[in-house]
A protein has these predicted regions:
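Structural signature of PLP-dependent enzymes
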Residues: 4, 11, 36-39, 51
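Anionic-ligand binding region
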Residues: 19-28
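Acyl-group handling in specialized metabolite and lipid biosynthesis
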Residues: 30-43
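A general structural signal for well-ordered alpha-helical packing
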Residues: 1, 5, 25, 45, ...
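Conserved anion/nucleotide-ligand pocket segment
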Residues: 1-19
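An anion-binding loop in the catalytic cleft
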Residues: 41-126
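Short, flexible turn/loop "capping" segments at secondary-structure junctions
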Residues: 29-32, 103-105
Length: 126
């Protein structure tokens, strides 16, 4: 709070010191596009989860295609799963009556919210 109390008067009266950006230390990133949110189940569960979080509402959403249907993922949870003998993309189990857990390159992901709702059976590959 002290920092805000010190900063606000300087900002309001225009006396806050301005520092020019050193462009030799800056970088430019292209505009995000649809391909940035494509889910590859060979990715780690951490990477998939972070992609979903980064692109969740109000953004475009992370997505994957299953049976010619485009699914957007809005919420996921990382599930620890060290079984290396299962290929990424396999539905390991269904929990809470309708939430699939899908094997990733490392660990697994529970899909909590998708659009449309993903309805799959255990053992299915996505």
């Amino acid at each position: 709070i002290e920092q805000i109390e010190e900063f606000m008067p300087l900002l309001i009266n225009g006396s806050y010191p301005k520092i020019k950006q050193d462009h030799s230390k800056s970088n430019i990133w292209r505009k995000r596009n649809k391909s940035d949110g494509l889910i590859d189940w060979r990715m780690s569960a951490d990477s998939i989860h972070n992609t979903v979080r980064a692109l969740s509402k109000p953004y475009i959403g992370a997505e994957f295609i299953h049976n010619d249907v485009n699914y957007k993922l809005w919420e996921t949870e990382i599930i620890k799963n060290n079984n290396k003998n299962i290929e990424p993309g396999k539905v390991l189990k269904i929990v809470d009556s309708d939430l699939p857990i899908i094997k990733c390159g490392i660990n697994a992901i529970k899909i909590i919210e998708s659009e449309p709702k993903l309805e799959v059976k255990k053992g299915t590959y996505i």
